[in-house]
A protein has these predicted regions:
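Polar low-complexity intrinsically disordered regions
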Residues: 1-5, 14, 167, 227-230
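Acidic/His- and Gly-rich active-site-bordering loop/insert found
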Residues: 2-108, 117-133
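Small-residue-enriched segments and motifs
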Residues: 56, 244-246
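Histidine/acidic-residue-rich, glycine-tolerant segments that coordinate divalent metal ions
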Residues: 67-68, 89-91, 96-107, 113-114, ...
Length: 246
């Protein structure tokens, strides 16, 4: 513990415990009403309700149900972006929880309801310390994380300019909950921490022929099968065991 800790952090743990019931309530509200993709009207409404009494400048997305909120500190300084995703997955919940999904075919199975509630509570805690903040905080509530390019939509609508010409974020932070870690712990490391899902598209061109003369045809199936095997082997033979790869 530093000899003279930043006063903005004084009592922060106790304050977080104080807002925990509110965080849990918002998370369960979102969990009951999960929404898919870019259009999340109920989710956005819940977020706006939670932010309504805070000293924030709020921007609503037009092409998607995004929310961007800006918290200005009392002194000039850099802009920090905090991001939380909001969309659910196309699954039917069968947990039996009293706050289980009420929407058939939609479930918060990846924790985005928790991420959204945590970000809203972070906005509240930071707002309580506004007079101690240097710079500003940009709060990014993102729809469409599960393959719908929600961040791209938000950037095209001016996310990075939401805090003004001098408010371009100098750093950005996000997190992801994990059921494999003890509750209350945080895991991080320098460099890459989580895998990114990239898309590789390959077209194999064949040539038809007669079944009696396969040697005159070009069968794409064996070639494609060999490529699948080679791509699987690439991770173990072309990437160091010390590097994160799946």
């Amino acid at each position: 513990m530093p000899a003279n800790p930043n006063p903005a952090f004084a009592g922060l743990t106790a304050a977080a415990h104080a807002v925990q019931p509110r965080t849990v309530a918002l998370r369960r509200r979102l969990h009951r009403h999960p929404e898919l993709g870019l259009q999340l009207p109920m989710t956005r409404s819940a977020v706006l309700d939670e932010l309504a009494d805070l000293p924030l400048t709020v921007h609503r997305g037009e092409s998607c149900s995004s929310v961007v909120a800006v918290l200005d500190g009392e002194r000039p300084g850099p802009t920090v972006l905090l991001r939380g995703d909001m969309d659910a997955l196309p699954l039917t919940e069968q947990t039996g929880l009293r706050y289980a999904s009420k929407i058939e075919g939609s479930m918060h199975a990846c924790g985005h309801d928790t991420h959204t509630a945590m970000l809203a509570s972070a906005a509240r805690l930071l707002s309580q310390r506004r007079e101690l903040l240097t710079g500003r905080v940009l709060l990014m509530f993102q729809p469409g994380e599960e393959g719908d390019h929600g961040a791209r939509h938000m950037i095209s609508e001016g996310l990075l300019d939401a805090a003004g010409p001098a408010g371009t974020p100098s750093s950005a932070y996000a997190l992801h909950i994990s059921a494999t870690m003890p509750s209350g712990s945080i895991q991080t490391r320098p460099g890459a921490l989580m895998a990114a899902a990239d898309v590789l598209r390959v077209t194999v061109h064949g040539r038809g022929g007669h079944a009696s003369a396969p040697h005159d045809a070009l069968d794409p199936v064996p070639a494609a099968a060999a490529m699948v095997g080679a791509l699987q082997t690439m991770v173990t033979r072309r990437v160091s065991a010390q590097e994160p790869a799946v």
